[in-house]
Amino acid sequence: MVEKRSRQSSSSGSEFSVPPDVDNPPLSIPLKTLSDRYQLIEKLGAGSFGCVTLAKAQFPLSNILGKQHDIRGTLMDQPKNGHQNYITKTQGVVAIKTMMTKLHTLQDYTRVREIKFILAIPANDHLIQIFEVFIDSENYQLHIVMECMEQNLYQMMKHRRRRVFSIPSLKSILSQILAGLKHIHEHNFFHRDLKPENILITPSTQYFEKEYMNQIGYQDNYVIKLADFGLARHVENKNPYTAYVSTRWYRSPEILLRSGYYSKPLDIWAFGCVAVEVTVFRALFPGANEIDQIWKILEVLGTPIKRSDFVNTNHITAPPPGGFWDDASNLVHKLNLKLPYVEGSSLDHLLSSSQLSDLSEVVKKCLRWDPNERATAQELCEMPFFENTVASQVDARGNVTNTEQALIFAGINPVATNTKPIYFNSSTKLPAETESNDIDISNNDHDSHAMCSPTLNQEKLTLVEFLNEFVEEDNDDHSIPDVGTDSTISDSIDETELSKEIRNNLALCQLPDEEVLDHSLSNIRQLTNDIEIINKDEADNMEQLFFDLEIPEKDEFQRKQPFNEHADIDEDIVLPYVNNSNYTHTDRSHHRGDNVLGDASLGDSFNSMPDFTPRNFLIPTLKKSREKFEPHLSNSNQHFGNVTF
């Protein structure tokens, strides 16, 4: 019989079990003492995975950059990046992401999705730099140490208000996002949560030494990095697919309509949504819930079902702006819904300026109903808008079409003879997710911005849910570098729906609450002034279409803090294609997290629907009573989920 050991945490005083394999930690995730290596300055945010803390390294960061023998070919292998983020590296400033849940064994941490991604993806200039990954030897929590960026893209846009990006800056920002996304896709992963909050930005003058910038001739005003790889998935992973990945506003039709399979095209859809939002400082599809999300897409892209399928139409017209999707009719029928006929609006109306005609073509290639019709990241890089940008200069390898990705998923080698398109079809839907609620790790409330399961209707994040969201099974078909990271634990837990982000719960983080009194760190604290802690309030008006471009006054959403002049490199530009007076992203968290799609009856799901949803959107047999949508502000609940590294 194995003796069960326990010890007392020095930070919280509580007892916890010592992992049975404490004497045999994974080679890729060693045991180290957090308090010996880093001084914790302040907590920046928290989410379902854990919390992010600003910290100062108590050793030169150059000691670990690219010098660890077991990290070659991973996101930690960055020996040539000494000039990047020079100021914060010199000061030893880092961001530490701490996993909130403790797993049974140390080897189990190698199954965490973000760890698998870090160990499988080579470093790239447009992905957040990872310094080290380790397990704290005092309380056995997982820590991911990464570079600290100034703010995320949403915060930058909100600070700028009416000052939209100039065309060169816009092109630079989007090309860097696309370059990072292309790098992920080339290595057969897809991000699954691309949104402005997960795109980090720092002015280039604060990121590089001036001498180095002049030496390499760096012209871009900003440095852009993709972050938060907790939902990243390998294309050959055949475990059941989660229905609630991605953030609702950037969620693709195949996810909204429960197609049963998705891959890289969902990132392309999200990129198209982000591209429009970064251009006009207004979310493209700000749905209040999933039904409203589908309706907002219909208003712009039109109905993807051929008009001959509708009773009162008997003449054929041109395809809708978003194209046709043969699977759509079957998918909505299985959800007990029906789509009204909507012609849609030309995508050219979204970006009407002649200066943005090339970008408009990019968006059209991204926002297609049928995932197989969307461009690949490589194809987007080759479009005129990205000519002579970093997106067009990256390595051209890994140019695989979406059809070939589906063939790979089906276990078929994509050779030249396989020319028949493989479609996303709900008839191949994978088995329903396993339901398990045995172990409850905390009494955490959920954020208001994500969907909860209609069948479980839980208010707690269980350990099983956490493992399903962030920890993969061991039977993945893709390989991870052989650095002793394979877990010896095997289970049959299927991947279930993505739970809502829990509120900031510092007790679960179990990080030492150390006060750093060193006055030399005042410049470090200054770095956090630009990282805005955003109130997760509910939006007060969601009834306007994006392309009306008349944004109601929402002063109550604006933070009472000075504008960050250092984050604004461009001149005060107000371009003719935008006339908004304030950028109010109306974050997804400002809305009620009503889940109105799924296996359960939809009858009671529309109680919080706005009045403008058309009546014929619902099958007549369903319950039609709906309460009027009464948005309200909630100042009592402050969340920190938008601060992402």
UniProtKB/Swiss-Prot annotation:
Biased composition (Low complexity): 8-17
Sequence positions that bind ATP: 44-52, 67
Single GO molecular function: ATP binding
Region named Disordered: 1-24
GO cellular component terms listed in the entry, alphabetical order: cytoplasm; nucleus
Gene3D superfamilies found in the cross-reference section: Phosphorylase Kinase, domain 1 (3.30.200.20), Transferase(Phosphotransferase) domain 1 (1.10.510.10)
Reactions it catalyzes: L-seryl-[protein] + ATP = O-phospho-L-seryl-[protein] + ADP + H(+); L-threonyl-[protein] + ATP = O-phospho-L-threonyl-[protein] + ADP + H(+)
Record Pfam families: Pkinase
GO BP terms, alphabetized: intracellular signal transduction; meiotic cell cycle; regulation of meiotic nuclear division; sporulation resulting in formation of a cellular spore
PROSITE patterns, alphabetized: PROTEIN_KINASE_DOM, PROTEIN_KINASE_ST
Domain Protein kinase: 38-386
UniProtKB keywords: ATP-binding, Kinase, Meiosis, Nucleotide-binding, Serine/threonine-protein kinase, Sporulation, Transferase
Coiled-coil regions listed in the entry: none
Active site per the UniProt annotation: 193
EC number assigned by the record: 2.7.11.1
SUPFAM superfamilies: Protein kinase-like (PK-like)
General function of this protein: Protein kinase which is essential for the initiation of meiosis and sporulation.
Family from the record: Belongs to the protein kinase superfamily. Ser/Thr protein kinase family.
Protein name: Meiosis induction protein kinase IME2/SME1
Record gene name: IME2
